[in-house]
Amino acid sequence: MVSSNFYKNLGPRKLTAIIDFLHDIIEPPKIHEDIAIHDIKILQEASPNDISFLSNPKYSEFLKTTKAAACIVPKNFTGEANPNTVLIHAENSYFAYGKLIDFFYTPIKSYPAKIMKSAIVADSATIGKNCYIGHNVVIEDDVIIGDNSIIEAGSFIGRGVTIGRNARIEQHVSINYTIIGDEVVILAGAKIGQDGFGFSTEKGVHHKIFHIGIVKIGNNVEIGSNITIDRGSLQDTIIEDLCRIDNLVQIGHGVKIGKGSIIVAQAGIAGSSTIGKYCALGGQVGIAGHLNIGDGTQVAAQGGVAQNIEAGKIVGGSPAVPIMDWHRQSIIMKQLVKTSNSKLKK
């Protein structure tokens, strides 16, 4: 249930207003009554004054019994539904749901154009128009922050860092040696631009390699909580436009992540590896160093990648192999365990 402590409901909204708002991404349905829609809820909890959505076919059974006045469904949905529920077909029902959230809700917390008194901002820093700088933020010399950006409480922005327009930096984020584009979101606790894990071993002693690269983050990127992104040793660490990186991900020095890639929680990418455009790495995936992962590659959760992967491949397992081979290996392993157990019983 949505808490009114944190989010303001902008409803009720007329069903026709909802259809008009989504008109470019849905097939407008025929409606017999223009009712008021009060809220968005899951199918199981929706009332006759609510709208719902279906994006995962696992939940299609609930459409038969839902009380929702309307439901956004995939374009090709032809299953059974409550006859009293208006079905709104969308090319991407989950995307339409996301747009609908924006139509119904807004955060109660606001960020006025203000620098809080407890913030420490260097005289040589440049703060754009309409920015919010929160309590106990530290902004060092020669930092540039673009217009309409938000830096929340306790964050540290190191000397020379550039942050573009419309950025949102949440609480207790640390950023050093980094250039960031526009429309970037960095969630709480992220650490960006620190030294990478680089040492040379001489006569049993591990000597630190001074890192002289930086981190470059493109436009419209989202970076999760407690992520760590190391700056390059010599080559820069680069995250291109439109990437989405989940919580607790480690990105090593000199890594390049291509445009539009998605990296799920607890994945780790070792130094100097290149991830192509529009790749997807599942949770806890590990990528060894100095590898090239081709555009459009998908790696299943907990996959361990130790060699280059051609573009468009889907792999899984550790060491990672083509996904069908991984499924076969899993089946064979189960059969071996059954055979072994039956022999032990004899």
Curated annotation (Swiss-Prot):
Output the lineage of the source organism: Bacteria, Pseudomonadati, Pseudomonadota, Alphaproteobacteria, Rickettsiales
The UniProt entry's GO CC annotations, sorted and at most eight, read: membrane
Q: Which GO terms describe its biological process?
A: lipid A biosynthetic process
The biological pathway it contributes to is: Bacterial outer membrane biogenesis; LPS lipid A biosynthesis
Indicate the quaternary assembly: Homotrimer.
Descriptive protein name: UDP-3-O-acylglucosamine N-acyltransferase
> Matching PROSITE patterns, A to Z?
HEXAPEP_TRANSFERASES
Checking HAMAP family in the record gives: LpxD
Q: Name one Pfam family in it.
A: LpxD
